[in-house]
């Protein structure tokens, strides 16, 4: 059985894939990106080539190169590098899984295939099992995101007996708002040392109460420090302070969601906050508008995300 060097927990940044204005991958800034996550945001785990990283818009060759660059630049700086290897083609997923093992990644994750879909738990398990077997020494994580895949198999059902079929299974990236399903995943697997990683950033505090051991998300690229403060407050059982942090984070997310928020806008915000050029997304996504970026910048400033000083006073009205 594959065991991680240590349990994947805490914040995991779903990394963006930087691109040039011509739509080519800009590998030159990934080293700077690593340093920014570690030093400025306090985030030392990453999830590469997922939704935020436009993994399914990249060629297999590009996905391999991106994975290699993150592993290389993250050596001795990052704690864990998880590579998403999901694809519509089983063979491509297996190739990417094997490659992740060869380059020294710390784990692999896979979404359900979403064009010709698996409609039952057993069919999905059979697909995941074949991918996991291509990297038998790596911890395996299932990436549950039914809103995008259209695969509605409940995670609770999937986890029932999963170690019998996939002995390298180590956890779940749960990117759904169904807290009943998530809670039952935790409750029914208390004897296992699974990593339960929540993937809806604006609801993280609720998931922590339900037993989440960590979180994977796009906002941890630029709100990692703030979210870590929420985690610290929660761990210290200062639930009022933790709630204040969550509400403040929600204010920003709620604001940008109303403007239209996705991968393109995440790239624009990350460029704004970090100073590292993330570039445009790849087609069919469109570059975020100047109006969006200006509005997001104004909201960040109004929320005083640089200090959070008023949160300790429980001031939930500031910056609204």
From Swiss-Prot:
One Gene Ontology cellular component: cytosol
Keywords per UniProt: Carbohydrate metabolism, Cytoplasm, Lyase, Schiff base
UniProt-annotated location(s): Cytoplasm
UniProt-recorded Gene Ontology molecular function terms: identical protein binding; N-acetylneuraminate lyase activity
Tissues where the protein occurs: Isoform 2 is expressed in placenta, liver, kidney, pancreas, spleen, thymus, ovary, small intestine and peripheral blood leukocyte.
Its EC number(s): 4.1.3.3
Residues forming the catalytic site: 143, 173
Gene3D superfamilies: Aldolase class I (3.20.20.70)
Disulphide-bridged cysteine pairs: none
Group of enzyme by EC: lyase
Annotated metabolic or biological route of this protein: Amino-sugar metabolism; N-acetylneuraminate degradation
Main location: cytoplasm
Amino acids binding aceneuramate: 51-52, 175, 199, 201-202, 218
Reactions mediated catalytically: aceneuramate = aldehydo-N-acetyl-D-mannosamine + pyruvate
Biological process terms in GO annotation: carbohydrate metabolic process; N-acetylneuraminate catabolic process
Subunit record text: Homotetramer.
Function: Catalyzes the cleavage of N-acetylneuraminic acid (sialic acid) to form pyruvate and N-acetylmannosamine via a Schiff base intermediate. It prevents sialic acids from being recycled and returning to the cell surface. Involved in the N-glycolylneuraminic acid (Neu5Gc) degradation pathway. Although human is not able to catalyze formation of Neu5Gc due to the inactive CMAHP enzyme, Neu5Gc is present in food and must be degraded.
Family statement: Belongs to the DapA family. NanA subfamily.
Protein's recorded name: N-acetylneuraminate lyase
Species whose genome carries this gene: Homo sapiens (Human)
Gene symbol of the encoding locus: NPL
